[in-house]
A protein has these predicted regions:
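Active-site-adjacent "lid/gating" segments in soluble enzymes
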Residues: 1-53
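Beta-rich nucleic-acid/ligand-interaction surfaces
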Residues: 6, 78, 117-121
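Short, surface-exposed loop/helix-turn segments at secondary-structure junctions
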Residues: 16-27, 121-136
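Aromatic-enriched alpha-helical interface/lid elements that frame and gate functional surfaces
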Residues: 32, 36-109
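Short, acidic/polar N-cap/turn motifs at the starts of alpha helices
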Residues: 38-40, 131, 148
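Conserved PLP cofactor-binding pocket of PLP-dependent enzymes
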Residues: 103-127
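Flexible, small-/acidic-enriched active-site or ligand-binding loops
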Residues: 134-174
Length: 174
């Protein structure tokens, strides 16, 4: 099932669970929301910033950009206190404001794109991620779902149609 593939993204939590019998809870590990340096923060306009300034040089730049009080930059506060402070700062400005600021700052931080923004992003367009089509009817063809499969296993760029409802029943319902 699709769920089986999700475990790949939980490598950190699975490693800790299997090796030390320490099973993760929500936001309790460094790479799962337990650190202010690797987290997701909500903006004033209810969008989100993906923040990953793990290395000190990126963290220091991030703190400078958001104007985080010096007492929160070091180890004088707990991670939870720093997360709460960063959350309160990020919520004061819109995603548009933060997007402009973080495009200029090298600190591993970006506004989380909407699905519409993501499919229109140059990164995906230049790689033809949505170029394959599925024929819906004589007039309509829609982009097929991209699959994480090596290009060598994909068919050429031909528009294919999907089976009509019930068309494959005899084949698969024996």
């Amino acid at each position: 099932s699709m769920t089986d593939g999700l475990f790949t993204f939980m490598f950190w939590a699975l490693g800790k669970g299997f090796s030390k019998n320490e099973w993760s809870q929500n936001s309790d590990y460094y790479l799962s929301g337990g650190s202010p340096r690797y987290n997701i923060y909500e903006t004033k306009d209810k969008r989100y910033l993906a923040v990953a300034p793990i290395e000190d040089r990126f963290w220091n730049k991030f703190c400078e950009v958001i104007d985080l009080d010096i007492t929160y930059k070091g180890q004088k506060k707990t991670d939870q206190e720093i997360i709460e402070k960063v959350t309160s700062i990020i919520k004061t400005k819109t995603s548009g404001y933060w997007d402009k600021v973080f495009q200029k700052a090298d600190c591993c931080c970006t506004v989380v794109k909407s699905l519409k923004e993501a499919v229109g992003d140059d990164h995906f367009i230049s790689r033809n991620l949505f170029s394959k089509k599925v024929k819906i009817n004589d007039e309509t063809a829609l982009p097929s779902l991209p699959l994480p499969i090596s290009k060598q296993f994909l068919s050429p760029k031909i528009i294919k149609s999907f089976p009509k409802l019930g068309e494959q029943n005899k084949t698969y319902m024996k």
